[in-house]
């Protein structure tokens, strides 16, 4: 919003934590969580750097991927395609971070499950971010989404026990965002 030549940035506060609501704010935290180059045989994505996986980006030179290139991929393939700007501001950070971890459809399913646990009118858990989902998530709390995100991580470990080594880091990340 422009007022008398000044731009005002609204910062959303949750408790004593300043909520990040823009791509430029959120991406720095995501890149920090994702870390640098890793080639762990137990990682479903295979070779990764900054969270960009060779499995999903076979034409990208992962080892030599720059931060700026990773940011561009995240902005185009995750933020814009994930419609992050349409999600309520208080949920943008966790939603984008879940898109990185679970893909867009998986992230939306977590939001839909969280909404269904709160709202009387249930929505279909189909992974689509349409009008019904956007309406249903308007007033769900960040803590409710965190709880369903932790559940999703737990189910991954239950289904694939070799992923247990990632559990504690996933759990911490779920609570930090």
PLM ranges: what are they?
Residues 11-177:
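Cell-wall polysaccharide-cleaving catalytic domain and substrate-binding groove, primarily
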Residues 2-3, 7:
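Polybasic, lysine-rich low-complexity intrinsically disordered segments
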